[in-house]
Curated annotation (Swiss-Prot):
A GO term for molecular function: DNA topoisomerase type II (double strand cut, ATP-hydrolyzing) inhibitor activity
Gene that specifies this protein: yacG
The name this protein goes by in its record: DNA gyrase inhibitor YacG
Cofactor: binding comment: Binds 1 zinc ion.
Record text on subunit structure and interactions: Interacts with GyrB.
Comp. bias intervals (Acidic residues): 55-65
Binding site for Zn(2+): 10, 13, 29, 33
């Protein structure tokens, strides 16, 4: 039985990466690409879209919800 090889693109640089145990940083091609991406999330350069945070300055009250 032939095992199917899955190839994905590194989300940081676009390099082809084999999806499997031989690629410990998957989906990234390297530790460097993984850490650059992590830094972008930590610096809030990347975010998952959603509703804005509610804070006291937004005029929020418990009566609204």
């Amino acid at each position: 039985m032939t095992k199917k090889l899955t190839i994905v693109k590194c989300p940081r640089c676009g390099t082809d990466v084999e999806w499997g145990e031989q690629s410990p940083h998957r989906p990234f091609c390297s530790k460097q690409c993984q850490m650059i991406d992590f830094g972008e999330w930590a610096d809030e350069e990347k975010a998952i879209p959603g509703a804005p945070d509610m804070s006291d300055s937004d005029g929020w009250s418990e009566d609204q919800y």
